[in-house]
Amino acid sequence: MADFLGMMKQAAQLQSKMKEMQSELDRIEVEGISGGGLVNVRMSAKMEVRAVKIDPSLLNPDEVGVLEDLLVSALADAHRKAEAAMQDKMKTLTGGLSLPPGLGL
C-alpha cells in the first residue's frame, strides 16, 4: 500500500511539473528565418505562431510562389527551433532523458 501511495504522490508531482513546463514553453519564443531575413516567423515552444513578418519587396503578385516557399521555409525553421527548445525543457523535467521526436507536451 505504501508503494501505491508513493506512486500517487510522484504522479501528482509530475503533473504539477508538467503544468509548470507548459507555462514555461508558452513564454519561450523562437524565430524562423528564410530568404536571408526577408520572411520571419515568431513561434512559441508550444508551436503557436505569434507573428509573421514579410519584407515588402516580396509582395509582388507575379512572384507569389516565391513568397509561399519562403513562408513554408521560415515556418519549418521556427518549428525545428521550437521542437529543440521543448526537448531541452523536457530534459530538465525527465532528469535528462529525451523524449522521442514528436512526443511533446
Curated annotation (Swiss-Prot):
Signal peptide: none
Compartments where located: Cytoplasm, Nucleoid
Disulfide bonds: none
GO cellular component, one term: bacterial nucleoid
GO MF annotations, alphabetized: DNA binding
Pfam families: YbaB_DNA_bd
Alphabetical UniProt keywords: Cytoplasm, DNA-binding
InterPro entries to which the protein is assigned, alphabetical: YbaB-like_sf, YbaB/EbfC
SUPFAM superfamilies found in the cross-reference section: YbaB-like (SSF82607)
Main location: cytoplasm
Stated role: Binds to DNA and alters its conformation. May be involved in regulation of gene expression, nucleoid organization and DNA protection.
Family of this protein: Belongs to the YbaB/EbfC family.
Description of how the protein assembles with itself and partners: Homodimer.
The protein, known as: Nucleoid-associated protein RPE_4812
Source organism of the structure: Rhodopseudomonas palustris (strain BisA53)
